[in-house]
Amino acid sequence: MMKTLALYGLTLALFFLSGAHSAKITFTNNCPRTIWPGTLTSDQKPQLPNTGFVLASKASLTLGVQAPWKGRFWARTRCTTNSGKFTCETADCSTGQVACNGNGAIPPASLVEINIAANRGMDFYDVSLVDGYNLPVSVATRGGTGDCKATSCRANVNAVCPAELQVKGSDASVLACKSACTAFNQPQYCCTGAFDTARTCPATKYSRIFKQQCPQAYSYAYDDSTSTFTCSGAPDYVITFCP
């Protein structure tokens, strides 16, 4: 019995010394239609137990994420199952299932990116339109210390999306807005090759459209100064689609 207690105490001590804690991430769907959020863990780490799920209008769901953790979240729209294969018209992850199983969203997709620190250290989080836009989204913290400001892209970017960036549905409505990188695959838009630094890859007329609509969100790869947010002390997070 004493040996069991000693081992339990050692395990508990190692747990706290390692800085392990679990952050709660709550997803809320304020959109008028059902969405299918997806999750992707970065850095070749194991995926979360739940990599995709259905979320009805006005519904919420909470996932626990063990720190340290880094990854992204998005929502798929207009999804259907035909002949046993699940597909979505925007932000599909191409698994044929609701679960994304380590696949990311096919652009365009509005993203929430979170880097949860160990030792209750400084987390980083953002809303990113680097891969384009499909839905309004926000992320806010609960608890934590420091700045801990909410960030969002609340605008309907689809309404002002240039024709050359538009993704249209079968009914001719604009479902999503591509990034210039996705649309044209040119290094000056993708910040690659000779354009792979902040100095050589400035904002473009296309990224400025995203920035004008959503000033807090990343509009292209080097849009860090106004788009990255921080919070320390092991906060929880609330991600709201159509805030």
UniProtKB/Swiss-Prot annotation:
Cystine connections:
31-242, 79-88, 93-100, 148-231, 153-214, 161-177, 181-190, 191-201
Where is this chain primarily localised? secreted
Cell inner membrane listed as a keyword? no
Q: What is this protein called?
A: Thaumatin-like protein 1
InterPro entries, A to Z: Osmotin/thaumatin-like_sf, Thaumatin, Thaumatin_CS
Any one GO BP annotation for this protein: killing of cells of another organism
Which gene name belongs to this protein?
A: TL1
CDD domains for this protein: TLP-PA
Q: Which organism is it from?
A: Castanea sativa (Sweet chestnut)
Where does it sit, as one GO cellular component term?
apoplast
